[in-house]
């Protein structure tokens, strides 16, 4: 059963009527451009065919009653008083989104009964949190007939995650969940918010393999990496590392390394990764999978050696995939790091061989069982 069907059926069962509003927002996978978004840089994700559905109906008071079907937990809060934090982590994503929409539209106090259901694997690096934030934001927009664009909804979700949940994420995850296009990757300029759709070549599959090494960005090293990048930007006297070219970095690399070796390594990753995204757009335009594969490999090496966010299980998965696909595609870690998933672009006729080499070796070597997905690039948030 899809998240949409599940949310609607459970709502009907609980409330004895059909929901007036159902919205759906997808998760995402980032093909290239990691930890560049909060440095005002470039990313190239696509929305995927896994996501989060929210079904609900207006109430005649100010109360939100929210049931998270997949967790079997309920949260309730009022919109006519200051919205406090919940002890349920998932509920804070919902509360944060509503709180910041209220800041923008103080008259928005419409109560609602909601059911949430999703199939984005939690803590996998595929943006279950952004899908939830964007779905709830779109639900609010429909509920209150608010003049919010999909970009507004995305940035409101980011604000909720930064300021209410406490994860200092960039804006990529929410933007792609809101703005994704079917069968396209979306190159996003995280400063101007300009998007450039790039078709996924027809003969290419988007493969995601979850290492099932759990990660938690709120308590992890994510915020430390962000501080190190800000330190490097200050050294170059720029607003963000986006403003430093590869040549400019190389000229002063030794100087920064002497001052702060870690900041230099982090900056080297971000500066070179931004260039790799721009090069990847050109490679895709030319249908040059060999070039794209090299860029993805260089991205992974940079995350492993300079940004230091991969783990041995992830590195091993990438090695296995590269053995099979050779020069006909690429593989790299995707997401915030410290576990989560790898992404690979490979010809459809290599998918079974990729699946087999991982099934034969990964669990035997690591003691963990992978989860294997073949995804399609999908449309962003929508009303059902």
From Swiss-Prot:
Residues that, per the record, bind Mg(2+): 129, 161
Q: Which domain of life is it from?
A: Bacteria
Residues annotated as site: Transition state stabilizer: 28
A GO cellular component annotated for this chain's UniProt record is:
cytosol
Catalytic residues identified in the record? 173
Residues noted as binding ATP in the record, renumbered to the chain: 123-129
Q: Where in the cell is it found?
A: Cytoplasm
Main location, first listed in the record:
cytoplasm
Molecular function as annotated in GO: ATP binding; galactokinase activity; magnesium ion binding
Q: Which residues bind substrate per the record?
A: 34-37, 222
Q: In which pathway does it act?
A: Carbohydrate metabolism; galactose metabolism
Q: Could you mention a single GO BP entry for this protein?
A: galactose metabolic process
Keyword Metal-binding among record annotations: yes
Does the entry feature the keyword ATP-binding, yes or no? yes
EC number, as in UniProt: 2.7.1.6
> What keywords sit in the KW lines?
ATP-binding, Carbohydrate metabolism, Cytoplasm, Galactose metabolism, Kinase, Magnesium, Metal-binding, Nucleotide-binding, Transferase
InterPro entries for the chain: Galactokinase (IPR000705), Galactokinase_bac (IPR022963), Galactokinase_CS (IPR019741), GalKase_N (IPR019539), GHMP_kinase_C_dom (IPR013750), GHMP_kinase_C_sf (IPR036554), GHMP_kinase_N_dom (IPR006204), GHMP_knse_ATP-bd_CS (IPR006203)
Catalysis: reaction(s) = alpha-D-galactose + ATP = alpha-D-galactose 1-phosphate + ADP + H(+)
Per the similarity annotation, which family is this? Belongs to the GHMP kinase family. GalK subfamily.
The record describes the protein's role as:
Catalyzes the transfer of the gamma-phosphate of ATP to D-galactose to form alpha-D-galactose-1-phosphate (Gal-1-P).
What is the protein name for this chain? Answer: Galactokinase
Source organism of this protein record:
Haemophilus influenzae (strain PittGG)
Give the gene symbol: galK
